[in-house]
Amino acid sequence: MKINKKFRNKSLAFVLPFMILVGCGTTAQEKGQEDSIVKVSASESNEEVKDTKDGENNRLPNVQILATGGTIAGGGESNTSTTDYKAGEVGVDELIKAVPEMKEIANVNGEQVVNIGSPDVTNEILLKLGKRVNELLASDNVDGIVITHGTDTLEETAYFLNLVVKSDKPVVVVGAMRPATAISADGPLNLYNAVKVASSKEARGKGTMVVLNDRIASARYVTKTNTTAPDTFKAEEMGYLGTIADDVYFNNTITRKHTTETDFDISTIEKLPQVDILYGHQNEGNYLFKAAVEAGSKGIVYAGSGNGSMSEVADEAAKEAEDAGIEIVRSSRTGNGVVTPKDYISANSLNPQKARILLMLSLAKTEDKEKIQQYFDEY
């Protein structure tokens, strides 16, 4: 992988001095929850002997890092550039070298899938990534997967994997809000924590997880809530699956179907149906619906106000699109709450961007409206 030399040295020079890999003290609230919290030591995750590469510890879990670019691999002109930088400047080998402490908890190997900003992730990249994850997890020599990813569309990729991965082994998606060259870059510790979670046997069966800022969230519920703050990823009303301090602590689980429980098999899929998102607003017209239909959309997610509300103009345009064979999903632009059923498919509690992911996979499987609604209610 060819790395921009201007950023290579800066990455290690500024990242490593700010690595703080020590656990925080347990709060009184955490102590009160001890009965419901599962404490996991990453080093205890797998005791059986593994076939390993030269130089690896065969008593540590094997974690594969799949790098896709993003801010975590970004580089800026100076160490104070936290917003003016280029994503995807640092390769996976440099990311791993910047956190040598990972070798104490896992045998880590890296693979560069792409090296781009996350707004450039396409359906083709999603399929490539999903198939590669399934291929790796089918091996007895891989215990968990960590995917480094840009934060702008991280939740979409994570939810996609939550629906298509066919393994109970941990899959963790991780990113950063500050580039690798910045003062107090958050990427190295986030990456270390992600490997720690992926190494944990208690992380099995929890679907795809997102790890940032010492928090473990389900891909189903997590969303980006701030443009630049390091604590941008929130699980909102549903809460986090767990936290990371000296060890990995799980205090919650996910009840929605995921990974091995879903109907989606992408092994033979080469192309996903086109699904677009239309944003509801005052004084809207019908031309965006018409444009989407003419452009070949197979489904439309409408991000309505409040409870997925539609204006009369939008409702009429949606009915015309539906008559033309286009599936319509009502979601909400509010970010929280369940969109109650009315006329069209309800996104349930999925935000518009995740509703798009589920509708694409649903349409690749069926055109039955009731079945698609069932997917939204269960997944």
Ranges and model annotations:
Residues 13-22:
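Bacterial N-terminal signal peptides
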Residues 46-134, 287:
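ATP/NTP phosphate-donor binding region
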Residues 174-245:
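Internal gly/pro-rich beta-alpha loop/helix module
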Residues 158-189, 195-199, 323-332:
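Short, acidic/small-residue loops that bind anionic groups at enzyme active sites
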Residues 25-27:
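Bacterial signal peptide processing site
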